[in-house]
Regions:
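Hydrophobic ligand-binding cavity/cleft-lining segments
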Residues: 1-47
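Short, surface-exposed coil-to-beta transition loops
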Residues: 3-5, 65-70, 91-96
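Beta-strand elements of well-folded, non-transmembrane domains
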Residues: 10-12, 58-62, 75, 89, ...
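A short, structured loop/turn motif at beta-sheet edges
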Residues: 13-15, 45, 74-79, 98-107
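Hydrophobic pocket/interface hotspot
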Residues: 17-21, 27, 73, 99, ...
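Glycine-rich portal/gate segments that line the openings of hydrophobic small-molecule binding cavities
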Residues: 39-86
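Beta-strand/loop substructures that line and gate deep hydrophobic ligand-binding cavities in soluble
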Residues: 84-129
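A conserved amphipathic terminal alpha-helix motif
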Residues: 114-152
Length: 152
């Protein structure tokens, strides 16, 4: 098993970050173009709550099919999220997200434990780049929203 851990300071209060974490559109925005997540059951809205499980068509770089990715939520509160995830190619993708309030900003940590047999090292290398990318997109999104809020 290999672990990726990435921490950044986000330019928004923890409640704002937690609110955005609850939206599938946030995941879809921050993951692109490294990955795309399309709900299997598009007729049902995605609602992440403790105990919920949801499945997505997962594509690497938006076009390479990489199986059905399942997310099971074990914890979901203002301090963060813990999910057990995986797919046919990566059976273990355990992902705590830790949110720490630091005034008008939030310390945000992604930690991912990965197990994919012989593919683990390659998936781990991709995941290091993916989580650095995700956090940069988070920061860009929050800055743009803050700019829009201040303009109005």
């Amino acid at each position: 098993m290999k672990t990726v851990r990435k921490t950044s300071v986000f330019p928004a209060k923890r409640d704002v970050v937690f609110s955005k974490l609850q939206e599938l559109s946030t995941l879809q925005y921050i993951a692109a173009p490294y990955a795309t997540f399309t709900p299997i059951d598009s007729a049902q809205p995605v609602v992440w709550t403790v105990g919920s499980t949801s499945s997505y068509r997962f594509r690497l770089f938006g076009f390479l099919p990489f199986g059905t990715h399942t997310i099971h939520i074990e914890r979901f509160d203002r301090d963060g999220i813990r999910s057990k995830e995986g797919n046919e190619h990566v059976p273990v993708w355990n992902h705590p997200i830790i949110l720490r309030d630091i005034g008008d900003q939030t310390e945000y940590t992604d930690q991912v434990d990965i197990e994919a047999g012989l593919k683990t090292v390659f998936i781990w290398l991709w995941a290091k780049a993916f989580y650095a990318h995700r956090q940069k997109k988070w920061i860009r999104m929050l800055k743009e929203q803050n700019h829009e809020y201040n303009r109005n």
